[in-house]
Amino acid sequence: AYRVDIKAFSEDFYRKVCGARLQPVLDSAVLARELGMHVEVVTLVIPGQNDSPQETGALIRWIRDNLGEDTPVHFTRFHPDHRMRDRGATPVAVLERIYRQAREEGLRFPYLGNVSPHPWESTYCPSCGALCIERYGYSVIFRELSGESCSRCGERIPYVRAGG
């Protein structure tokens, strides 16, 4: 499995905040997918930095078009710890808007993170809506899952079990 942190979908953000470039990050995710790896994307949503509907929409469409609609994408809540203490935590309503935007744009497995408890931390079958994998903090319960498929309708559910 390959987890890639796409910090923002802006070269300006990468240059100013990360001292890096966005394109190599995107290229590494595409290469991992081309090599047949299970790729998951994580984006820490920072208020006023990378949370606009335009930027999140561009990121979502890039993931769908370059990594595939089945790519799990985790939109995680920012908390003002460590270096960025000049802004508050990401409002849950903003994360919920991004989740809905991801679903509307065709991503089948978006998730919210750092918001426990929240139903959108869990995995739902995109075909029948069954709760396949329930997440609550660090707890994971496999529910309507048979192997790699939804036990209700047979839809493939992409995931990797910890430790293998």
Give a label for each model feature.
Residues 1-90:
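Conserved AdoMet/S-adenosylmethionine-binding subsite of the radical SAM
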